[in-house]
Amino acid sequence: MDLPFGPRYNIGIDVGGTNTDGVLYDCVDKRIVASVKIPTEHASYAKAIDNSLKALTASIDDNGSEVASVNISTTVSTNALLEGKGEPSNLILIGFDRYPHIVSDIEGAIGPSSVLKVRGGHTGWGKERETFDPRAVENFAKDHRGELFTVSSMYSPRNPRHETAAKEILLANGSGHVTCSHELSYSRLNSVKRTVTAYLNTSLVPLAERLIDDIGSVAKKYGLSCPVMFLRSDSALVPSEWCRRFPIEMIYSGPAASLRGACHIAGGESLDSFVAVDIGGTSTDIGRIYLGRAVFSDAGAKIGSYQTMIPSLNIMSIALGGDSRTEVCGTEDIRIGPERSVPLCMTAQDSGLQAETVIKDLLGCPDEAEGIGRSEADGSPKPLMTDDVPRTADLGKWMAMGYSYTPTDAFNTMELSEVGDPKISKAASYLKGKKAGTAGYDLAEAVAVKAHSMLESSISEYTSACGQLPRVYVGTPAKVFAKLGDNGEAEITVPRNFDVAGAVGAAVSSIELNCRVSIMHSFSDESFRSEERRVG
């Protein structure tokens, strides 16, 4: 079918910490044609995207020419910063000699490879305070040829000329990527936040380049010649080449996609103002939709201890998900998260073993493991066996391989979900319960109550300024948490396609072009000139 406006499909892919979700979206009929959910492999994000594209393109009759765009939201930038996996960068500070306290704050926040303090900088009016020293920058560049650089000049949002001059010198002398702080300041002042933002951006560039190159190769593999776009923290799409230059803008890409997706799929529920709650395997993101539009943050995106100047939606992220590692010492002593692990219910599927074999291994009682499984399977709070758990029962073997008891195992035990093999979850709940002096079902129920309490507390904190609002829950465990919260106090909706909301958000997002025009005063002849900058 030839359409006058070109290809009819968008592909949206949301690479999360636990799963990679994908959808094939029909832009003409405004519907989801196909969806897919694949476990994320942290060693190779591109592999998860490859598997997603393979499944989605199988739903298209032609060779991919009907796909207009592949839109990707990803937590790669976020995870790299949280895990300290960014590349080190050299830092050039221009005109900061008079402000040692600012330099100290900057160095304390980011720990650059090396620092060069250069004469120069401007005043708050954009007037040159000192003459720029190009020779010092040139010598520094030659000493660090091929390395990454971040350049920050005093009051560069008012006048970026010294930063621009330094960047030209660095590139002319064989440097790697160079980020100037004014490029990510959005015309706002704050020397520390501006410099930290630029430095973090530089540290992410090598990772972004590898990811973009890998994704480009994967797209070609499936005959996709369309653009590959990325979702920014403000939920706007940008070309991959923009992401290559400014990967820091993608730090809230995943939550932005979820919020955009929740807004889109909740439209059919006639909701235009609500709190969107995306509950994943690793974390939960809470955002707000007001009159059909996402609410923005005044402070900018914050990741870990880093406060940046990147425009972002007003999102609260908490370390709570279906796969959060759960430690239990008793029904009143439960710790959920912040670490993520693989639920025990996945052990049989991942290892290729029979569920009964895993249960015997977990409980250390091969003659009676089958009876335990049946006891817990019927939902009874009292297990069939009443004797002590054998001393050989231990989860240590599986924990060493990255597995542990999680809220998902608790939900399986309560028969609120059926993830992996629920029999294994019930056996693990039995084991945990016996060690805590309670029944396995009661133990699971206590974990579920704790998880729900953590979510409720965070939502209450987030909505403290705007009051009670309807809620839209999305993400794989959305239905479970909606049922746990079904007490009549909050209006909770779980819309269709709730489990792939992030991918839907990526698929339906659009390009936005923003320009800022600065009126610059020339102190040499008292004239004024305009300077237009594309910022997105």
PLM regions and their residue ranges:
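N-terminally biased helix-coil "hinge/interface" segments that flank
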Residues: 1-534
